[in-house]
């Protein structure tokens, strides 16, 4: 590691796209997760996004960041980011989690994340190879945390 990190903005590095409405009454139980601003809210028979991606809370649970390893449907209370050749998606997920987007509430009645303000955030990003190495390390730690959670659930069920 040790390549030059570049200064850019969130909007240039990983532009947020708007999710698309999918009311509960129109959802058909299926294999693809449906995400809102607070995480997974159901499933559907077809995905809007045909790859893995990042989901960012736009309305309600402002700035929450979720990752889908499978194709998914982000509803209109969320933004999403998909992979691109210049960035590692897992690195991007971890980077977005570290930005404090949940502190960027722009609306008073219903909490909301202003895309323009989020896009304007200055960030520094490493070369792709370093992004991949960082994501690998953090992903291993996430896997270990999940394994520990599963072990705790199993032990609690046995007690």
Predicted segments, located by residue:
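Non-catalytic DNA-recognition/assembly elements of restriction-modification systems
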Residues: 1-36, 124-159
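A short beta-sheet element
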Residues: 36-101, 106-109, 114-118
């Amino acid at each position: 590691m040790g390549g030059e990190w570049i200064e850019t903005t969130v909007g240039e590095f990983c532009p947020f796209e708007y999710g698309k409405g999918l009311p509960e009454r129109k959802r058909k139980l299926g294999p693809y997760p449906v995400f809102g601003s607070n995480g997974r809210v159901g499933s559907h028979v077809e995905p809007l996004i045909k790859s893995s991606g990042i989901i960012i809370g736009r309305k309600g649970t402002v700035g929450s960041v979720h990752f889908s390893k499978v194709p998914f449907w982000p509803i209109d209370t969320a933004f999403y980011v998909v992979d691109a050749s210049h960035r590692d998606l897992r690195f991007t997920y971890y980077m977005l989690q570290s930005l404090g987007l949940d502190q960027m509430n722009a609306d008073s009645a219903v909490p909301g994340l202003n895309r323009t303000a989020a896009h304007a955030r200055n960030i520094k990003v490493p070369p792709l190879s370093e992004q991949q190495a960082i994501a690998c390390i953090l992903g291993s730690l996430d896997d270990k945390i999940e394994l520990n959670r599963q072990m705790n659930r199993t032990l609690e069920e046995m007690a």
